Amino acid sequence: MSPRERQAALVLFSGGQDSSVCLAWALERYDRVETVGFDYGQRHAIEMQARQAVRREVAARFPQWAERLGEDHVLDIRSFGAVAQSALTADRAIEMTERGLPSTFVPGRNLVFLTYAAALADRRGIDALVGGMCETDFSGYPDCRRDTLDAMQAALNLGMDRNFRIETPLMWLTKAQTWGLSKQLGGEALVSLIVEESHTCYQGERGQLHAWGHGCGTCPACELREKGYVEWDMAGREALAQ
């Protein structure tokens, strides 16, 4: 399929590294790209602020993408966060639970996000739902697995009589390869934007800017982001091969 053959996409956009790369990926391929974010009672408001910063800087630094960047939607689903509590929505330690999952796992989060995104996409006339889910460097979250997303895609299409596609460009990439994809899509300018503006840290830390971005440097999200950056940097900062 040639670039930008399909017309519109809706990116599930948190303002983190992965969804920021997915936004750039979609902007390279679609004529119109809208974004959707979810207020589900996250402990740190910085996540919602980062979304706007990334969108603003993408439009400012990449004029070729600015004309394709469409409307942003923010959906209030805090009632879901109150039910599906985790270390991301409540003041809890980040640790492994008895189920073998990190306490940062929000049960059903991606399933809920995709349901809301599909309902929005239906209204907006969009078939492609783009998300940053990944099996390679993920934290064991079952709703990041491709088989989960395939089942969700089938359920949405059956239940809404549509032909949605859940696209996951990072699914089989390591974090180092995700940095390489950033370089491929937008050069060092996009890498710098993601370092400076995106937010990953579970602790909401924005005070210190490391080579790989803002963050506490000790939570699992920061450690994974730093590890990927260091591996990519030491390997020569190459763009991901197409």
From Swiss-Prot:
PANTHER family: 7-CYANO-7-DEAZAGUANINE SYNTHASE. GO terms for molecular function: ATP binding; ligase activity, forming carbon-nitrogen bonds; zinc ion binding. The keyword ATP-binding applies. Keywords: ATP-binding, Ligase, Metal-binding, Nucleotide-binding, Queuosine biosynthesis, Zinc. Belongs to the QueC family. The lineage of its organism: Bacteria, Pseudomonadati, Pseudomonadota, Alphaproteobacteria, Caulobacterales. Its EC number is 6.3.4.20. Binds 1 zinc ion per subunit. GO terms for biological process: queuosine biosynthetic process. Its cofactor is Zn(2+). This is 7-cyano-7-deazaguanine synthase. Catalyzes the ATP-dependent conversion of 7-carboxy-7-deazaguanine (CDG) to 7-cyano-7-deazaguanine (preQ(0)). Gene3D superfamilies: HUPs (3.40.50.620). It catalyses: 7-carboxy-7-deazaguanine + NH4(+) + ATP = 7-cyano-7-deazaguanine + ADP + phosphate + H2O + H(+).
